Amino acid sequence: MAQEAVLFREALGEVLRAERMRRGLTLRELSGRARISLGYISEVERGQKEASSELLASLCEALEIGLGTVLRVVSDNIVAAERAHAPITLPVGANSGDVVASAA
């Protein structure tokens, strides 16, 4: 069975929504601060729209969080999701048949 790919836009949307909620902001408040339509922000948060670099910069500024921080959290979340769904492989020694790595 093929592993479902983690989409960047979905991971980004989850991080942006979590940050907005952590700050206690409504979509309407964030929309006003970022000067981006409420509907578009909602679609970005749900992973339905790709955020341009300009839009992402506006959202980060409105959320008072650095772009690098957002991208690092998104990257960490993607890596964690990929690891959680990665098949477990146990390489064995070439001649001895001894296990040289474990799944732990």
State what each model feature region is.
Residues R20, S31, C60:
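The alpha-helix within a helix-turn-helix
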Residues R72-A104:
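Short, charged recognition helix plus adjacent turn
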Residues M1-R22:
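A short, Lys/Arg-rich alpha-helix, primarily the initiator
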Residues L16, L27, L38, S53-L56:
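Helix-turn-helix DNA-binding elements, focusing on the entry/boundary residues of the two helices
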